[in-house]
């Protein structure tokens, strides 16, 4: 049959190159199920509002369910998008006098905006679950290592002793903020634009609240012009994905470094490694390296979305067709990265003996030694900093005698004369004592870390319940939609 969209206004058919250039059919695979759901909800509402009769409603609903069963491959890919292709298939099945009524009071503009939001909210829910599992993996590993000493780093130089638990929880805290950002974005994604039509709404007596309810949205995007033209929710989500990928790339970088011969802190499971085509001894951390590289997918998608949306006049413009494929690439990459990082964390072998041995190299206890001088002798911290800095030049383990000789140069008197004892020096140079004394909120002291881990586990359980609630709401909505569809089909 002729193209149902172009046959009235346009005489010339598009050649293959133009069709390929303008078609979104391949990208629309993401929204096939969502488009069926939107059509079902819209048709139910049309019948309830008396815009179509019961018999036509039944035929349209049955046809839509048949199309869903057949799958997208049965659609005609010569159309420019899934919406027209799906409607054309429906008309083939039930005739134009019936199928041609489905689009009453609707535009592709509000239709596609609704489809995108349906798919995106499902992706967000899945991503929230996956972030939750990764955070749980980090906390579970941290609980085993609250007393496992390791060097902390600044500028990639040994800085102060800490624990593996403290380090892992730093990553979990960042992921917790990623979780919060994405969960917050969900509230702006889960709003319904359906009923906005092209941009000026419609003269048909539609019930927008009814389609919102049938599709499980939390509310309406009320201004019809804003409803069809806004893609700020895509930019917001892509920004959240980028932030998340940047945090994952930092974790991946550490896995690469820590698994090197020079560090030897961990060994990655063979599943996440590859070897060389020429050097048979190699075990390369390729998966973690690729995760660093794939951060560019998320960053690139965000930049593309910003560029596409920048400067667009109201309301709908076809530029927006190019926006969603960028988002789908980003969310696919990000979700896979989170799942794979969870697997790497769960299966990697930690080498506590190496971590402990490295915790004192590079004079990591220098800060505590300076702090001890301040607490025990009353000298200013900046003076203590100078004394310890001069001791660090010697590259030897400081003794009270050596400390006194340097203090004589700086202060004109020894620190032992001000009350410093050899026992105090030894305590300050003990890496475990360094960690144990740091028991203020957020510090690495084992007792503080155990309290912190308990609080984080409580927060994770609350997050799990919040995810379950989101899923229950949307699952219940679709169950009700299908129940209503089946009722109207039988009628």
From Swiss-Prot:
Q: Which reaction does it catalyse?
A: 2-(N(omega)-L-arginino)succinate = fumarate + L-arginine
**Pfam families linked to this entry:** ASL_C2, Lyase_1
Q: Which InterPro entries match?
A: Arg_succ_lyase_C, Argininosuccinate_lyase, Fumarase/histidase_N, Fumarate_lyase_fam, Fumarate_lyase_N, L-Aspartase-like
Q: In which pathway does it act?
A: Amino-acid biosynthesis; L-arginine biosynthesis; L-arginine from L-ornithine and carbamoyl phosphate: step 3/3
Q: Looking at its record, which EC class is this enzyme? A: lyase
Q: What processes in GO biological process is this protein linked to?
A: arginine biosynthetic process via ornithine; L-arginine biosynthetic process
**A single MF term (Gene Ontology):** argininosuccinate lyase activity
Q: Which SUPFAM superfamilies match?
A: L-aspartase-like (SSF48557)
Gene3D superfamilies according to UniProt = Fumarase/aspartase (C-terminal domain), Fumarase/aspartase (Central domain), Fumarase/aspartase (N-terminal domain)
Query: Which terms are listed as keywords in the entry?
Result: Amino-acid biosynthesis, Arginine biosynthesis, Cytoplasm, Lyase
Localisation? Cytoplasm
Q: What is its EC number?
A: 4.3.2.1
How is this protein annotated for GO cellular component? cytosol
HAMAP family reported for this sequence: Arg_succ_lyase (MF_00006)
Protein family (similarity comment): Belongs to the lyase 1 family. Argininosuccinate lyase subfamily.
Name assigned to this protein? Argininosuccinate lyase
Species of the source:
Methanosarcina barkeri (strain Fusaro / DSM 804)
């Amino acid at each position: 049959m002729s193209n149902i969209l172009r046959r009235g206004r346009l005489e010339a058919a598009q050649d293959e190159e133009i069709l390929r250039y303008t078609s979104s059919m391949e990208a629309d695979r993401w929204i096939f199920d969502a488009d069926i759901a939107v059509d079902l909800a819209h048709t139910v509402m049309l019948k309830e509002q008396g815009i179509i009769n019961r018999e036509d409603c039944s035929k349209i609903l049955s046809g839509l369910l048949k199309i869903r069963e057949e799958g997208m491959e049965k659609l005609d890919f010569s159309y420019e998008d899934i919406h027209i292709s799906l409607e054309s298939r429906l008309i083939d099945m039930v005739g134009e006098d019936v199928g041609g009524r489905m689009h009453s009071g609707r535009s592709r503009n509000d239709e596609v905006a609704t489809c995108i939001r349906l798919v995106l909210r499902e992706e967000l829910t899945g991503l929230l679950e996956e972030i939750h599992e990764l955070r749980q993996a980090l906390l579970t590993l941290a609980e085993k290592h609250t007393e496992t000493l390791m060097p902390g780093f600044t500028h990639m130089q040994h800085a102060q002793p800490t624990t593996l638990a403290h380090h892992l929880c730093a990553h979990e805290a960042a992921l917790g903020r990623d979780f919060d950002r994405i969960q917050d974005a969900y509230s702006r994604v889960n709003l319904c634009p359906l009923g906005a039509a092209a941009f000026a709404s419609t003269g048909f007596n539609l019930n927008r609240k009814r389609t919102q309810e049938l599709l499980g949205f939390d509310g309406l995007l009320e201004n019809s012009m804003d409803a069809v033209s806004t893609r700020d929710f895509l930019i917001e989500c892509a920004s959240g994905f980028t932030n998340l990928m940047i945090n994952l790339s930092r974790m991946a970088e550490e896995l690469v470094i820590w698994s090197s011969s020079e560090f030897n802190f961990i060994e990655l499971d063979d599943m996440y490694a590859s070897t060389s085509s020429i050097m048979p001894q190699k075990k390369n951390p390729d998966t973690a390296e690729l995760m660093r590289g794939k951060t560019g997918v998320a960053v690139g998608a965000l930049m593309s979305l910003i560029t596409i949306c920048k400067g667009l006049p109201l309301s709908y413009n076809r530029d927006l067709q190019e926006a969603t494929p960028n988002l789908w690439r980003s969310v696919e990459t990000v979700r896979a990265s989170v799942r794979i990082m969870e697997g790497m964390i769960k299966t990697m072998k930690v080498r506590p003996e190496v971590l402990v041995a490295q915790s004192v190299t590079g004079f990591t206890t220098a800060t505590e030694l300076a702090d001890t001088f301040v607490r025990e002798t009353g000298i200013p911290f900046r003076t203590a900093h100078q004394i310890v800095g001069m001791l660090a030049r010697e590259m030897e383990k400081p003794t009270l005698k050596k400390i006194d000789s340097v203090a004589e140069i700086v202060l004109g008197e020894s620190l032992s004369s001000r009350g410093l004892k050899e026992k105090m020096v030894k305590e300050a140079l003990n890496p475990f004592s360094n960690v144990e004394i740091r028991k203020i909120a957020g510090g690495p002291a084992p007792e503080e870390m155990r309290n912190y881990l308990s609080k984080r586990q409580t927060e994770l359980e609350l997050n799990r319940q919040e995810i379950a609630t989101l899923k229950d709401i949307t699952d219940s909505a679709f169950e009700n939609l299908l129940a209503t569809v089946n009722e109207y089909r039988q009628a």
